[in-house]
């Protein structure tokens, strides 16, 4: 794969609906492959983005009922933005893929979600929370920012590693 020193950046706006998840997956999969990620890392990106977008639809937009959605300031400028949307931006740098998911729903900071107690008996575990745990485990970095009037941005970063290493390839995986 030949890459210039300039990062490649591509954005696409999707309706914030569960039936958009397949299209979002195709979009990020193509960018992950162009970024040179190995098959396991591509799969990790697919799972993390699917879970993150599901969380945006469910929590930021109140499922597809869209309860409590903030008006989008650019709705007149962009007809596609009138309905709740998820803007997916993929930025390919020399050694990583950066995915930003931007929405105008209620803020939902993944940092406020504690890791689940995986050792606890199933009857003692809280419902939910595993998706956020998977996102954290599958990606190399996860950041969240909410700016009033501008929306929420979830940034997911996956670094390129040799294809023979596992999804979470660090010194312990070698």
Predicted regions and their residues:
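Conserved short strand/loop->alpha-helix "switch" segment adjacent to the catalytic nucleotide/phosphoryl-transfer site
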Residues: 26-50, 123-126
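Short, well-structured hydrophobic secondary-structure segments
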Residues: 48-58
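Short, structured helix-loop boundary elements
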Residues: 18-21, 42, 46, 83, ...
């Amino acid at each position: 794969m030949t890459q210039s020193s300039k990062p490649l950046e591509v954005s696409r706006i999707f309706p914030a609906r569960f039936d958009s998840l397949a299209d979002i997956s195709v979009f990020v999969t193509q960018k992950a492959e162009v970024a040179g990620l190995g098959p396991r890392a591509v799969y990790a990106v697919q799972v993390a983005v699917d879970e993150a977008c599901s969380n945006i639809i469910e929590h930021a937009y109140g499922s597809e009922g869209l309860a409590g959605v903030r008006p989008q300031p650019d709705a007149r400028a962009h007809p596609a933005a009138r309905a709740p949307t998820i803007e997916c931006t993929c930025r390919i740098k020399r050694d990583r893929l950066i995915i930003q998911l931007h929405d105008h729903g209620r803020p939902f900071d993944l940092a406020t979600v504690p890791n689940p107690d995986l050792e606890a008996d199933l009857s003692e575990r809280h419902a939910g929370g595993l998706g956020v745990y998977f996102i954290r485990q599958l990606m190399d970095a996860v950041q969240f920012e909410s700016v009033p009037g501008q929306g929420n941005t979830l940034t997911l970063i996956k670094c390129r590693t040799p294809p023979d290493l596992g999804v979470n390839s660090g010194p312990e995986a070698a």
